[in-house]
UniProtKB/Swiss-Prot annotation:
Keywords: Glycoprotein, Signal. Part of the gene cluster that mediates the biosynthesis of notoamide, a fungal indole alkaloid that belongs to a family of natural products containing a characteristic bicyclo[2.2.2]diazaoctane core. The first step of notoamide biosynthesis involves coupling of L-proline and L-tryptophan by the bimodular NRPS notE, to produce cyclo-L-tryptophan-L-proline called brevianamide F. It comes from the Eukaryota. The lineage of its organism: Eukaryota, Fungi, Dikarya, Ascomycota, Pezizomycotina. This is Notoamide biosynthesis cluster protein J. Glycans are attached at N159, N167, N192, N235, N282, N340, N346. Residues 1-22 form the signal peptide. The keyword Translocase does not apply. InterPro entries: DUF4185, Glyco_hydro_beta-prop_sf. Notoamides have been shown to exhibit antitumoral activities. Notoamides A-C show moderate cytotoxicity against HeLa and L1210 cells with IC(50) values in the range of 22-52 mg/ml, but the IC(50) value of notoamide D is greater than 100 mg/ml. Moreover, notoamide C induces G2/M-cell cycle arrest at a concentration of 6.3 mg/ml.
Length: 370
């Protein structure tokens, strides 16, 4: 059985024997969003999935991007496997009860939420190059109210080695936020599997979109920063690196690391008060945790890490931590989407056997303070 996401492989490597307390963690679970018993499962067949990356649709709604998705609770009984899919909600996460999904991309009313764009699904990636593609997973999304266009950054996965191996990161484009087309624009992984432009998070500020990227996991590496004019995102030559030349920092240079670490998927959002927030899984030890940082500018300096979510110590695996765009820097107004893999099989088996695990995976809303 295929796993639910790349992060399961990362966490299987570093968490299988961990028993971690939740002390010193700031964010607390508010509501489980995914399941057969939730709107996601009952209305759109999104009963087990992960990620739930939220991005602003600029129409009063937030789109949530999910990875490998099935319409059954238990992965070993998987039906209707597809990735990526999108659910939407205009409900503020601070309201009583938290987020409730109200619609799905690509379907009117109720019905099976379809995948958003082509996925090779253990086959050809569709580029005509004969590239093998195990699956496609979303990195982040962004929309532009001036044109109504949406762009999703995605990851083409070749295989789930340790660390797992992407073919490339790429962009998918939509004029309506419902159906997307993969573009030729892509950032190829290198032969050493160390390219630092594979996992993306994107945030617009004025005329620029700031793109933060890391390499595939689990491996130590840099976090890089680029920017691109918002209306030229599909043109790789328009991307400007933020780099150090030995004397000072500046744009239009080869990228230099703004941070180093064992990063899971990064999430960066500019909050309404101008604060920049960053959240990611710090996988540097046998007790990884979801942490946050803040800054006044995308270039930094970034604050020290603040622990938001620790593992629960009950055999489940928590990962993600994607920032809801309506979060603020005020107390208890940092809203995070956190994935939870719960296995019903032997978690002490090798990483290579993770694909044989049995269990379920869901996404919950956590609420904390930046």
């Amino acid at each position: 059985m295929r796993i639910m996401s790349i992060m399961l492989h990362l966490l299987a490597t570093i968490l299988l024997s961990s028993a971690v307390s939740a002390q010193n963690a700031n964010a607390a679970s508010t509501r489980r969003l995914i399941g057969e018993d939730r709107e996601s499962g009952r209305r759109w067949g999104v009963a087990a999935t992960d990620l739930g990356i939220p991005y602003d649709q600029h129409n009063g709604e937030i789109g949530f991007l999910f990875g490998d998705t099935v319409s059954t609770k238990w992965v070993q009984e998987a039906k209707d496997l597809r990735s990526p899919v999108m659910l939407r909600s205009g409900i503020h996460p601070g309201e009583d009860g938290g987020i409730v999904f109200e619609s799905a991309a690509g379907v009117d009313g109720d019905g099976l939420a379809p995948r958003l764009f082509y996925n090779g699904d253990r086959g050809d990636d569709g580029t005509g190059t004969g590239t093998w593609e195990f699956t496609v997973l979303p990195n982040d999304g962004i929309s532009f109210p001036e044109t109504g266009e949406h762009i999703i950054s995605y990851l083409s996965i070749m295989n789930f080695t340790t660390p797992w191996t992407p073919n490339y990161s790429g962009l998918a484009y939509s004029t309506d936020g419902n159906t997307f087309t993969r573009l030729p624009t892509k950032w190829l992984n290198n032969d050493n599997n160390t390219d630092p432009f594979q996992m993306w998070t994107m945030q617009r500020d004025g005329d620029w979109v700031y793109v933060f990227t890391v390499r595939s996991a689990p491996q130590y590496g840099p976090l890089m920063l680029q920017r691109v004019p918002w209306d030229k995102m599909t043109n790789k030559t328009e991307y400007q690196g933020w780099g150090w030349n030995g004397e000072d920092w500046g744009w239009q240079r080869p990228c230099s690391p703004i941070l180093d670490g064992y990063f899971g998927e990064p999430s960066v959002r500019r909050l309404h008060d101008g604060t920049w927030a960053m959240v990611y899984l710090n996988a540097s030890t046998s007790t990884p945790h979801i942490v946050s940082r803040s800054a006044k500018d995308p270039t930094g300096p970034w604050s020290e890490e603040k622990v938001q979510v620790n593992q629960e110590g009950d055999g489940s695996l928590l990962y993600g931590g994607f920032i809801h765009p309506w979060s603020t820097s005020k107390g208890n107004q940092l809203y995070l989407m956190v994935s939870n893999w719960t296995s019903t099989s032997n978690l002490s088996q090798t990483t290579e056997a993770v694909a044989d695990y049995e269990g379920t995976v869901s996404v919950s809303q956590f609420t904390g303070t930046l």
